[in-house]
Design a protein with these regions (language model features):
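Acidic, Ser/Pro/Thr-rich low-complexity regulatory regions
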Residues: 1-113
Length: 113
């Protein structure tokens, strides 16, 4: 298993709040579109309520700076949930990027089975 380097850990702690803000801005734009629809006010209200409840479970909203040992899982989850892309990891070490790619491949393979 890949050992997380201090440089990667510090970079993650720096980038996480930025990633979360960008993700939440995207969610807010999607909520605004939902509210602009021609549906009845009650339908929009309950659809928005349901959506926000679901989005609260997303790593882009709820992840905090957990321990270094969970970094690999968190990055993989953030990519799978489309909070960030593989390109967002370009400043991280090559080892971490490769390890994350392997985790994603394993996840996708398991989904296909």
């Amino acid at each position: 298993m890949y050992q997380i380097e201090e440089k990667d850990w510090k970079l993650y702690r720096e980038k996480l709040p930025e990633w979360q803000e960008v993700y939440m801005e995207r969610l807010i734009r999607e909520y605004a579109e939902l509210l602009k629809s021609d549906k009845a006010a009650s339908e929009k209200f309950w659809a928005l309520d349901k959506r926000i409840r679901a989005d609260r479970q997303s790593l882009g909203v709820r992840v905090i700076e957990e321990g270094r040992s969970k970094l690999q899982n968190i990055l993989t989850g953030l990519i799978i949930e489309h909070v960030v892309s593989v390109d967002d990891l370009q400043d991280f070490s090559e080892e971490l990027r490769e390890s994350t790619s392997q985790w994603i491949q394993t996840y996708c393979k398991n989904l296909a089975e």
